[in-house]
Swiss-Prot record:
Record's comment on post-translational modification: Phosphorylation in the motor domain, induced by EGF, results in translocation of MYO6 from the cell surface to membrane ruffles and affects F-actin dynamics. Phosphorylated in vitro by p21-activated kinase (PAK).
Region (SAH): 917-984
Protein known as: Unconventional myosin-VI
Region (Interaction with TOM1): 1158-1286
Positions of post-translational Phosphoserine modification: 267, 604, 1156
Annotated organism of origin: Bos taurus (Bovine)
Xref: Pfam families: MYO6_lever (PF21521), Myosin-VI_CBD (PF16521), Myosin_head (PF00063)
Quaternary data: Homodimer; dimerization seems to implicate the unfolding of the three-helix bundle region creating an additional calmodulin binding site, and cargo binding. Able to function as a monomer under specific conditions in vitro. Forms a complex with CFTR and DAB2 in the apical membrane of epithelial cells. Component of the DISP/DOCK7-induced septin displacement complex, at least composed of DOCK7, LRCH3 and MYO6.
Gene name linked to the record: MYO6
Primary residence: Golgi
């Protein structure tokens, strides 16, 4: 198969593996892995892709691959990753794979300089190239830019963000302190906002949008950081293998002894907010020794330090302090920050116990007194007030008047713990807000022309246990994925369609329904949660039940019992829900959803913290106090500040800002779950590529144009440098002249209605045109002027030549017309008088024989006068007949009758002469005359036979035409019948297409859900439950249908194998193939498990007509699917393989497809029944064709060929292609199945093409002339030809 070329087939861990196709199944291909002779496996046909010829080759831009598909995309990234080339392009989108080690010199200052001002594609792929492109776009297009850095946690988003900021400040900074401050702000933000998780040692637990602002000279003037959704729950509790925010550990490890004493710090295991997670420090061998032993926890001493090339708690503390100094924080402010951090740690160590009184309240434990004292000291609070506020809550009664009575309500232990944690989270959250504000204050700007924003926000998260933080993060990623879809897929395709570029449409999964599920008004999960928070006694269970009740039929929402992970099946329906995100299904446990959605403290704690003696603490809460003046607490109820809706508002503002800018994308990829270097886990990387939309982008970029410019923008850019004669040019014509002057290849760009577009990888040419340097623009204008002069002179030359050619052509045509008229007149006259002319010729021949009669008579001695008289009489009769023929209209029969009488008379006279001729010489002459007469008689008989044969052929052609007209009338009658039910059929098909589209979305989501569950299972060591194993009987009971996606009104669930099988049905080539499948009906023979070779052998040997018909039908069906696969996965920039002319393979079969078997069962016979009825009917066809490469050429330059076909019943037996400039191509069934037309006779529409059918003799003459007999004989001798009518006839002839 495929001449032994390798293909990519799916592999469970590597993503894809290379192999060869050895057999074609009903919906799958049999693959033999390379290097594993004899070992085969089945792969669904839509999951198999052709491989590059050189498997070790890598390209910088995936759009440069010969085959553009997800397998070659993955392999190219893998090959480059193995060579430590972690960056790859897909057009102008950068794919960055996290190497998990430092690659030498890749981010050096020399590397930064090498990318400055360079077009995308002229240097190896790099994050610096994207940053420089954003800067140049901002400068040329006069438009702010955004760089969206996305990817899963641990994929390298934060590091790439830092490299972008460093590049912009070092390359285009103003040379002042502000450049360093922008870069130095990162360590400070990471210290307070990043933490170790199970999937990332330096995970950003907040989102940030960093804006670098530029003045009119395109120099950096300042920056601004916006932050989103700090994960506050991490402050109080972490997972076993996770840590709190870095600042806590860095303070414990790196603070001086003086600071430690002032802040009362010790090792992390002594603090509740740290000791429930990992308490080990990040350190290398040297810095581990610098950390004092009393600062290390037992866990650290036992297991050693954590290792990461980018993290070092002791060294990072020093770097953080240096960064604080550079951005303008003095020692006092720095100590204030540390003091609040330490105060939060001590606050977490306060414990409570039951009071033991009837009031039902609680008291502080004795061992917590010290922690209470430290906390009050560090936060500037009164110790007694803090104790009271943590154990009681103040309520106001309004019954007695406007002021009411103050009542202190004691809190239970659990309520006190919650109040303590709420205070800790609030304090730290305000501290983080303050850090971000101080960072923004350190690089202020007065005026800004444009900015470049870099978005770094937490990637899609999926853990064994997911809470409100993961819900908000994944909601954010849903919105960002939608923005990516809109900007790259939707808007691009709409622009291509609007500009008339004719780019094929690329389908992608729209996640709007998932976003609506979360954020829709009243019905969205966030609004349901807010409504729950406003209830007098809110509960997580009531909230969860409300979500399920309001969205019980929503595709994107499900109950935990339907999770693919066993651990989630134990969660009750009112304790969680599953959301099917774009990247896969995530199960959320709703415990604490209500609590985490409220950002407000109860009045006692808020009053306490706002009235702190410490000025710094009061400043932290001043802004929030001012914001909340309008929402005062009433009657002792907790005020409510919605975290979810606050985040939604921030996110919408962010997206509005992104939509107003030009966008560049960096897709970060996590190569493995173990976070180790040089470990490439293909399957999970493929999943990331699919979820990030890279596969859809690859499909779009096959015919896409990522760079574009408006005609008017280009024209206006050059206008002031143009002379007057050029300024009069139309903008479109000027652009065309500009591209011609630059010598650009027409394949690399395309003109739309208002813009010019460039192919992927042609960014250097685009930048050359868009370069706004005055000298460069003036030089280009000169080249345009020179090109216009040359082109116009050439046009004058061509016009002159064309006029001369036209004159000669007119003269030639006039002469040809005269010749045609003469010829036609002659032919008409000849056809009219043909019998008389033939009669005159025959009579004239008879007259010539009179000379010989006279010679014989003159030689006679006796009876000469009498014989002369008889000869004269005969001559007179001949002359009279000739005159009669010339003067009157006689029929062929009349002429023949009189001619025969004359012949008889001449024969009588001849016999008389023979009696009188005694001499041998005279007898010899008479004998010769007799021979001549005999020859004449034979010639007349041959003429008569030829005439009858011609009449017979004319009769057969008339019968064929009559048969074609009859078939045409029958077809029209069927079409008339179909039109009566067309509206109903079209409605049904529209519903089927809609259901199929919805089903494909469901199937794609099912696949992503399963892949995500597998990844969670691998990372959490859980087992995944396969539905097929869980309930096989239930699956067997389902009636799967290739089109309908609902069974008895309910949506069905499918396994990935069934999903892929159905998706492969879509590959079948167009409506003709689907119509054949639909017409097949119920089958007597189940051939689904037969191999391709078995089908072929049965066709060659079977005598069972029904089995033979079934095998042929299945054989050709598989050929259709296989050829559809080849067509879809053909090489780029290659001509489409033609097994038959386009008019045959693209025949409009829609009328037959629209006929559903249930609605019009008599419209068409099943294929097998057709074959039985047409079993020995032989039909021959001939149609012209034009090669695809010539179809857009001038009509005079097109090279037309002829395509011949011999159909044995419904299937093709022999095929010929006659080309004008190369030898004929001969094909026979069996030997050349892969190259022949695979459609049956009805599907080709040949029987409905006027003049297409020819006589067997016409086919056989061409076949024999081209060497067809020898070719067929060699195929028979080598046992490659399939038994057909042609093989049987040839074998009989040879015998």
């Amino acid at each position: 198969m495929e001449d032994g070329r390798p293909v990519w087939a799916p592999h469970p861990t590597e993503g894809f593996q290379m192999g060869n196709i050895v057999d074609i199944g009903p919906d799958s291909l049999t693959i033999e892995p390379l290097g594993q002779k004899g070992k085969t496996f089945l792969a669904l046909i839509n999951q198999v892709f052709p491989a590059e010829e050189d498997s070790k080759k890598d390209v910088e831009d995936n759009c440069s691959l010969m085959y553009l598909n997800e397998a070659t995309l993955l392999h190219n990234i893998k090959v480059r990753y193995s060579k430590d080339r972690i960056y790859t392009y897909v057009a102008n989108i950068l794919i960055a794979v996290n190497p998990y080690f430092d690659i030498p010199k890749i981010y050096s200052s020399d590397s930064i300089k090498s990318y400055q001002g360079k077009s995308l594609g002229t240097m190896p792929p790099h994050v610096f190239a994207i940053a420089d492109k954003a800067f140049r776009d901002m400068k040329v297009l006069k438009m702010s830019q955004s760089i969206i850095v996305s990817g899963e946690s641990g994929a390298g988003k934060t590091e790439n963000t830092k490299f972008v900021l460093r590049y912009l400040t070092e390359s285009y900074g103003s040379g002042q302190d502000i450049d360093d401050r922008i870069v130095e702000a990162n360590p400070l933000l990471e210290a307070f906002g990043n933490a170790k998780t199970v999937r990332n040692n330096n995970s950003s637990r907040f989102g940030k949008f960093v804006e670098i602002h530029f003045n009119e000279k395109s120099s950096v003037v300042g920056g601004f950081v916006s932050h989103y959704l700090l994960e506050k729950s991490r402050i109080c509790v972490q997972g076993k293998e996770e840590r709190n925010y870095h600042i806590f550990y860095r303070l414990c490890a790196g603070a001086s002894e003086d600071i430690r004493e002032r802040l009362h710090l010790s090792s992390p295991d002594n603090f509740r907010y740290l000791n429930r997670g990992c308490t080990r420090y990040f350190a290398n061998k040297e810095t581990d020794k610098q950390i004092l032993q009393n600062r290390k926890t037992p866990e650290h001493l036992k297991a050693g330090s954590l290792k990461d090339p980018l993290l070092d708690d002791h060294g990072d503390f020093v770097r953080m302090c240096t960064a604080m100094k550079k951005i303008g924080l003095d020692d006092e402010e720095k100590l204030d920050l540390f003091r609040v951090v330490a105060g939060v740690l001590h606050l977490g160590n306060i414990d409570f116990e039951e009071a033991g009184s009837t009031s039902g309240g609680c008291n502080l434990k004795n061992k917590s007194t010290q922690s209470l004292e430290y906390c009050a000291e560090l936060l500037g609070l009164d110790q007694d007030d803090l104790r009271v506020s943590l154990t009681t809550r103040v309520m106001l009664t309004t019954a007695g008047g406007t002021k009411g009575t103050v009542i202190k309500v004691p809190l239970k232990v659990e309520q006190a713990n919650n109040a303590r944690d709420a205070l800790a989270k609030t304090v730290y959250s305000h501290l983080f807000d303050h850090v971000v504000n101080r960072v923004n204050q350190c690089f202020p700007f007065e005026t800004s022309s444009y900015f470049i924003g870099v978005l770094d926000i937490a990637g899609f998260e999926y853990f064994e246990h997911n809470s409100f933080e993961q819900f908000c993060i994944n909601y954010c990623n849903e919105k960002l994925q939608q923005f990516f879809n809109e900007r790259i897929l939707k808007e691009e395709q709409e622009l291509y369609q609007k500009e008339g570029l004719g780019v094929n449409e690329v389908h992608y999964v729209d996640n709007q329904d998932c976003i609506d599920l979360i954020e829709a008004k009243l019905m969205g999960i966030l609004d349901i949660l807010d409504e729950e928070n406003r209830l007098p006694q809110p509960s997580d269970q009531h909230f969860t039940s409300a979500v399920h009740q309001k969205h019980k039929d929503h595709f994107r929402l499900s109950i935990p019992r339907k999770s693919k992970l066993a651990v989630h099946r134990n969660i009750r329906d009112d304790e969680g829900f599953i959301v099917r995100h774009f990247a896969g299904a995530v199960c959320y446990e709703t415990t604490q959803f209500v609590e985490k959605n409220n950002d407000a403290l109860h009045m006692s704690l808020e009053s306490l913290i706002c009235e702190s003696r410490d000025k710094f603490i009061r400043e932290l809460f001043e802004s929030s106090t001012n914001n909340n003046k309008d929402t005062k607490q009433k009657a002792g109820k907790l005020s409510f500040i919605s975290v979810g809706n606050k985040f939604k508002t921030q996110l919408n503002l962010l997206l509005d800002k992104l939509r107003s800018t030009g966008a560049s994308f960096i897709r970060c990829i996590k190569p493995n779950l173990k976070m180790t270097s040089h470990d490439f886990e293909g399957a999970q990387i493929l999943s990331q590529l699919q979820c990030s939309g890279m596969v859809s982008v690859l499909d779009l970029m096959q015919g896409g144009f990522p760079s574009r410019a408006s005609f008017h923008e280009l024209y206006n850019m050059y206008k002031k440098y143009m002379p007057d004669k050029l300024a009069r040019l139309d903008p479109r014509l000027f652009c065309k002249a500009l591209f011609k002057a630059l010598g650009l290849n027409e394949v690399d760009y395309k003109f739309g209605l208002t813009k010019v577009f460039f192919r992927p990888g042609k960014f250097a040419e685009f930048d050359q045109i868009m370069k706004s340097d005055p000298d460069h623009l003036a030089q280009l204008v000169k080249r345009v002027n020179h090109w216009l002069i040359c082109s116009r002179w050439k046009k004058v030359q061509w016009c002159s030549l064309s006029v001369i050619k036209l004159k000669n052509k007119i003269k030639y045509r006039a002469e040809a017309c005269i010749k045609m008229q003469k010829t036609i007149r002659m032919w008409l006259c000849k056809r009219r008088h043909k019998p008389r002319i033939d009669g005159l010729v025959k009579v004239g021949t008879l007259k010539k024989r009179l000379d010989k009669f006279n010679e014989v008579v003159s030689a006679l001695k006796d009876g000469k006068a009498e014989m002369n008289k008889q000869v004269k009489d005969l001559e007179i009769s001949i002359d009279a007949l000739m005159a009669k023929i010339k003067s009157t209209m006689m029929t062929r029969e009349q002429i023949q009758k009189e001619y025969d009488a004359l012949v008889k008379s001449s024969e009588v006279l001849l016999s008389a002469l023979q009696k009188k001729k005694q001499q041998e010489e005279e007898a010899e002459r008479l004998r010769r005359i007799q021979e001549e007469m005999e020859k004449e008689r034979k010639r007349r008989e041959e003429d008569e036979q030829r005439r009858r044969k011609e009449e017979e052929e004319r009769r057969m052609k008339l019968e064929m035409e009559a048969k074609r007209k009859q078939e045409e009338e029958e077809r029209k009658k069927r079409e008339d019948d179909e039109k009566r039910i067309q509206a109903e059929v079209e409605a049904q098909l529209a519903r089927q297409r809609e259901e199929e589209s919805q089903q494909q979305a469901v199937l794609e989501q099912e696949r992503r859900d399963r892949e995500l569950a597998l990844r969670i299972a691998r990372s959490e060591a859980e087992l995944i439950i396969d539905e097929a194993q869980a309930d096989p009987a239930a699956l067997r009971s389902l009636d799967f249908h290739p089109v309908t996606s609902k069974i008895n009104g309910t949506r069905r669930t499918m396994t990935p194998e069934q999903m892929a099988k159905e998706m492969s049905e879509i590959l079948s080539r167009g409506p003709a193939v689907q119509a054949t499948k639909a017409a097949a009906g119920t089958k007597k023979h189940d051939l689904s498990k037969w191999k391709y070779a078995e089908l072929r052998d049965t066709i060659n040997t079977s005598c069972d007509i029904e089995l033979l018909a079934a095998c042929r039908e299945e054989f050709h069906r598989r050929l259709k699917v296989y050829h559809a696969w080849k067509s879809k996965n053909k090489k780029r920039n290659t001509e489409t393989e033609q097994r038959a002319p386009k008019s045959v393979t693209d025949y409009d079969f829609a009328p037959f497809l629209n006929n559903s078997p249930q609605q019009n069962p008599a419209a068409q016979l099943p294929a097998r029944q057709q074959e039985i009825e047409m079993n020995r009917q032989q039909r021959f066809f001939r149609i012209p064709f034009i090669r695809p490469a010539d179809q857009y050429k001038d009509p005079q330059n097109k090279k037309k060929g002829w395509w011949y076909a011999h159909f044995d019943g419904p299937w093709i037996a022999r095929q010929m292609e006659l080309h004008p400039d190369k030898p004929p191509i001969l094909l026979v069934a069996g030997k050349d199945d892969m190259e022949m037309c695979e459609l049956n006779l009805e599907e080709t529409g040949l029987t409905r093409k006027r003049g297409a059918e020819i006589l067997p003799r016409q086919f056989e003459e061409i076949w024999e002339r081209c060497g067809g007999i020898q070719y067929l004989q060699s195929a028979i001798e080598s046992r490659q030809a399939r038994p057909t009518y042609a093989t049987a006839m040839l074998q009989n002839l040879l015998k």
